[in-house]
Amino acid sequence: GYQTQAIDSVGKVHTVDCDGPASINNNFTQQGSIGFPAAVMIANTWNIDMAYAFGDSIGKMADEMDVSGWYAPAMNTHRSAFGGRNFEYYSEDGVLAGNMAASAVIGAKEHGVYAYIKHFAMNDQETRRTDMLCTWANEQAMREIYFKPFEIAVKKGGTTAVMSAFSYIGPVYAAGTPELMQTVLRDEWGFRGMVISDGFSSSYFQNADQVVRAGNDACLVAFDTPETHMRVRSNAALQAMRTACHNIMYT
């Protein structure tokens, strides 16, 4: 799985995170996992107890596999019936999606597993999503539709982990948008915890200095990196990294 190393001097433990909105992906654990119904099927029940039971089962499996974090629930919006990942997103209704996700987060948390709600935000199209896909919306649409599931999962579910999106919001990379990562998520909604990017270095536009300064605390890298992606050594950059470390350890 994706890992962070232990740092004994500050009491940070080694962690392993895994992908899979409907299971614990065995590409990472090398162990079999129960596959559950797709998120859209769970949402069709309108039953938050069912969503909780799903999260609870994921948490039990993750705990048995020594998995710390789960890259899910995925909770973007069904903007079209032909959306490429509608199967792993709950609904076109942000309130329904948010309540389902919050219940799943709470269920997983019962077993010490933190759930990364994703992809924050407006990652509602697969076509060219990793190629600087600029998404435009007014503030009312953002808050009432596209942000709503995440807001509910933060406030009701108490999630301590978020995965940011590949998409651009207007002309700015979502993970590098301080108005999203800090102002809305932390200042307005009261989120405490870490934000990790979607796959990092898979797209040429991703810049570690930009995202860490914006409030995106970690970069999801699937290969060994001999040195940090952070190349700026100013006082501001160092303070941003300290803040990111604090957020990661809180999660």
Provide a role label for each language-model segment.
Residues 1-251:
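Glycoside hydrolase catalytic-domain context in secreted enzymes
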